[in-house]
Amino acid sequence: MNLFTEIRTLVTAELGAMTEAGDLPAGLDLSAVAVEPPRDPAHGDMSTNAAMVLAKPSGKPPRAIAEALATRLAADPRISSAEVAGPGFLNLRLRPAVWQGMVATILKAGDTYGRSTIGAGQKVNVEFVSANPTGPMHVGHVRGAVVGDALARLLAYAGWNVTREYYINDGGAQVDVLARSAFERYREAHGLEPEIREGLYPGDYLIPVGEALKAKYGDSLLDKGEQHWLTEVREFATEMMMQMIREDLAALGVEMDVYSSEKALYGTGKIEAALDRLKEMDLIYEGVLEPPKGKTPEDWEPREQTLFRSTAHGDDVDRPVKKSDGSWTYFAPDIAYHYDKVTRGFDQLIDIFGADHGGYVKRMKAAVAALSAGRVPLDIKLIQLVKLWKNGEPFKMSKRAGTYVTLRDVVEQVGTDVTRFVMLTRKNDATLDFDFDKVLEQSKENPVFYVQYANARINSVLRKAREQGMDVSDATLATADLDRLDHPAEIALIAKLAEWPRLVEIAARTNEPHRVAFYLHELASELHGLWNRGNDEAGLRFLQEDPVVSQAKIALARAVGVVICAGLGILGVTPVEEMR
């Protein structure tokens, strides 16, 4: 149950009544009418912009609309007051019984409280990580993996049919570099000195690949030229790298539904089919692009190329898809891959890219808009850098990887749950500081601990209540005398719980799972605040001598626990029942 949706329904119903009474003209568009928490809680429990958005189309002063609407709303038994503020904003206060009833609603709904159907079963493809299969996942991949997986969980929670997908970049030159690097480790496995030339991958992670190559091929490749072993070693090493990446993802609690190969697009006609589709729309032509200002991109050349007219769909310049020598640009297989997604019947596409792919956003959106005739929206989320710190200094590289901190480095130091939560404590497009010391601190400043400690405190209340012989099942707690929850701090905590269904829908519509982490921190803060006040005010403690009062307060604590566990589930974090 979304209380904000319920009150918005009341507001629109009263606006309809005003229309019938002749106070408003017929045919007004009410889609922009919103009911939200006010910016300042002192102004009320909810606020609506109805009068402000209807003033111009109705030709009436906003304050006059607000005053008439306030009179009608104040007559509803759920509303204790409706006050006009400023030029026409309307602030509402709800009766305590509405808030108290929310506790029973949450306990009866259990883990379905907050779940939404706004996705309406639409098929959404979330492509994320898609790291080159050339080594173990690094910390930058970790953030993208967590954001993508949490987003997929969020969308499923809100009613979408979600497919998690990994695009294997196995068609470019980097996998040839991988093969050459692995071959040097193969030579090393035979007792020869590896020649890790500049440009090759130096990490120790390729040593097992070399040993595996030796086990499979013996010394049969040692005396052969590159042209005889490159293809076999490339495929062998790529598969071993993908197995390593799958294990890395599993360590992070991420499971993909689909792995798609870039290499599979070549030689199958899929690239040609996608470009033929664009050609049918007169979006492919032969031409010479003006030289770009500043840094020259890899796909620019001062000769005639095959170009995609991406400017027809919002891009800044048209983009090359085939070079003058007849080879494809990097963009061509990406177009084909996204066309494949469109033809698989997805209603929505989401790509999670590293921040260094920012220049790709407009061209990729243009391609999808053209290939889907505007039917399939593409949202691209850019993941900013993660800065690692330990002992007050930047965290050093991993010897195993050779050049960077790996996913395993992070997870082995702090655990999967801490890693996942911390990666969602900032919006995806903001740089994130990950301090190995601070994320393990048991302090208010550590958001992971703060939220988990709230859940642990709730479970301690439930344990003590059981020890006293109380029935603390959700069904029994839902029948508690909830009007005993009348302190402003208790009402404020319930009001925060009431925001959960609305928060879920906003986060899902904007594809922003970090909002869930932010909300959980706010909810934990309300719970801890009430708990700490109980240290000074005995009447606010969750366990009371009066069993009727105690049951009501335990019901509130349990309702908070329901929402915390639901939120942590979306983040892919296991709730802690007891702090150790």
Curated annotation (Swiss-Prot):
A single GO CC term for this protein reads: cytoplasm
Q: Which GO terms describe its molecular function?
A: arginine-tRNA ligase activity; ATP binding
Catalysis: reaction(s): tRNA(Arg) + L-arginine + ATP = L-arginyl-tRNA(Arg) + AMP + diphosphate
InterPro entries associated with the record: aa-tRNA-synth_I_CS, Arg-tRNA-ligase, Arg-tRNA-synth_N, Arg-tRNA-synth_N_sf, ArgRS_core, DALR_anticod-bd, Rossmann-like_a/b/a_fold, tRNAsynth_Ia_anticodon-bd
GO BP annotations of the record are: arginyl-tRNA aminoacylation
Location comes to: Cytoplasm
Cross-referenced SUPFAM superfamilies, in alphabetical order? Anticodon-binding domain of a subclass of class I aminoacyl-tRNA synthetases (SSF47323), Arginyl-tRNA synthetase (ArgRS), N-terminal 'additional' domain (SSF55190), Nucleotidylyl transferase (SSF52374)
Q: Which CDD domains match?
A: ArgRS_core
Q: List the PROSITE patterns.
A: AA_TRNA_LIGASE_I
- Classification via SMART domains: Arg_tRNA_synt_N, DALR_1
Motif span ('HIGH' region)?
Answer: 131-141
Write out the entry's keywords from A to Z. Aminoacyl-tRNA synthetase, ATP-binding, Cytoplasm, Ligase, Nucleotide-binding, Protein biosynthesis
Report the EC code(s) recorded for this entry. 6.1.1.19
UniProt family annotation: Belongs to the class-I aminoacyl-tRNA synthetase family.
Subunit-level organization: Monomer.
Quote the NCBIfam families the UniProt record gives: argS
Q: What is this protein called?
A: Arginine--tRNA ligase
Protein's gene: argS
